[in-house]
A protein has these predicted regions:
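Catalytic alpha/beta core domains of metabolic enzymes, predominantly
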Residues: 177-284, 290-292
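Active-site beta->alpha loop and helix N-cap motifs at the rims of alpha/beta catalytic domains
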Residues: 38-181
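Short helix-capping segments at alpha-helix termini
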Residues: 105-111, 135-136, 165-169, 195-198, ...
Length: 345
């Protein structure tokens, strides 16, 4: 059975570099487990995966298997599928179920699998959640719809999410204003977490959001908030080292080089903080390029295809296409990244 590295960060009381003693945080301790668990203690890297398509737009289930193997070999501690970068809104309900079934079949319980379940209404959310949980998914992820604007509307919406999902489904609160256009203040996030017994994880990707992250971690440290796993996003973890310093438990995002996030989290957990920053810096130019609004997914899929992870870089229509100049940029950044990584060894 594949062995996965799991990072346990139950205690944040000892000091470590970068003045973290001021906020009572310490890097997580590494432990080895055969299986990681999706709960409030989850740590490490939950990779947001792409959805592979054939050139004609059909689901590519063979590439799906290959992609899952690649993710597991990279050392991720979990997978999150049918997220924003997974083109979930371009799949039919039947395709979504087929894709989830394929991923779960390939993973075989080696790491937790979380499924994006955000929907315009609660009926499709309930239907998809029941379906994927019956298949063996470990939980679902929910983001607020663009129709909620006030604090009361946002909190009321998630009260209904709790009613819809019920007491047996653990779920992730996704805070990503760039995609949802919904700005959830720190106080709103805290209220949702306090009112949601089965919300075990916050996918924090507000930007700028380091202050919000610190406030939420401090609320937990003071006992004002139940223990909640906090994994961060922002495509390729653009602020991952800083977020780990502030108390994040790891990352839940996507990048064509998931081993970067795994290596950064491992180095940080081992107390090698400067090395974690050095590893991150080597990948940052390409991560930044991949984070571009509009073409970011095309960049990621192009690189994954070049790495042999998926057979085609196809994005289901409507979607962006890379120009020859875009591809030249990627090739240059990749060469420079390879040299920087050689210099690190």
């Amino acid at each position: 059975m594949l062995r996965c590295t799991v990072y346990s960060s139950d205690v944040r009381t000892a000091a470590f570099p970068l003045d973290c003693k001021k906020i009572n945080f310490q890097p997580p301790q590494i432990q080895e487990f055969k299986l990681s668990t999706f709960n409030a203690s989850a740590t490490g890297v939950y990779l947001i995966t792409v959805t592979p398509f054939k050139d004609n737009g059909d689901l590519d289930l063979a590439s799906t298997d290959k992609m899952v193997d690649f993710c597991l070999e990279s050392g991720v501690t979990g997978l999150t599928i049918l997220g924003i970068m997974g083109e979930a809104t371009k799949l039919t309900a039947e395709e979504s179920r087929l894709y989830v079934k394929q991923v779960l079949s390939r993973v075989q319980g080696k790491v937790p699998v979380v499924v994006g379940a955000s929907a315009p209404g609660f009926a499709p959310m309930s239907e998809l959640t029941k379906s994927v949980m019956d298949m063996g998914a470990d939980g679902v992820m929910v983001a607020p719809p663009s129709t909620v604007r006030t604090d009361d509307q946002i909190c009321g919406y998630f009260d209904m999410v709790n009613e819809t999902l019920g007491p047996d489904v653990p779920w992730v609160l996704q805070d990503h204003p760039v995609s949802t256009t919904v700005q959830m203040s720190t106080s709103v996030v805290l209220k949702i977490l306090k009112n949601s017994p089965r919300c075990v994880m916050l996918k924090h990707e507000d930007w700028p959001g380091l202050g919000k992250l610190t406030a939420i971690c401090q609320a937990m440290a003071k006992g004002e908030l139940k223990k909640t796993s906090i994994l961060t996003g922002n495509g390729g973890g653009l602020f991952l080292p800083e977020e780990l310093v502030r108390g994040a438990n790891g990352a839940m995002t996507g990048f064509a080089y998931p081993e970067m996030m795994v290596d950064v989290c491992r180095a940080f957990a081992a107390g090698e903080v400067e090395r974690a920053f050095d590893i991150f810096d080597a990948y940052l130019p390409l991560a930044k390029y991949e984070q571009q609004q509009g073409i970011g997914l095309a960049v990621r899929k192009h690189i994954l295809a070049q790495r042999g992870v998926i057979a085609s870089s196809a994005i289901r229509k409507p979607g962006p296409k890379l120009s020859a100049l875009d591809i030249a940029d990627i090739e240059r950044l990749t060469r420079r990244q390879e040299q920087k990584l050689r210099d690190l060894t």
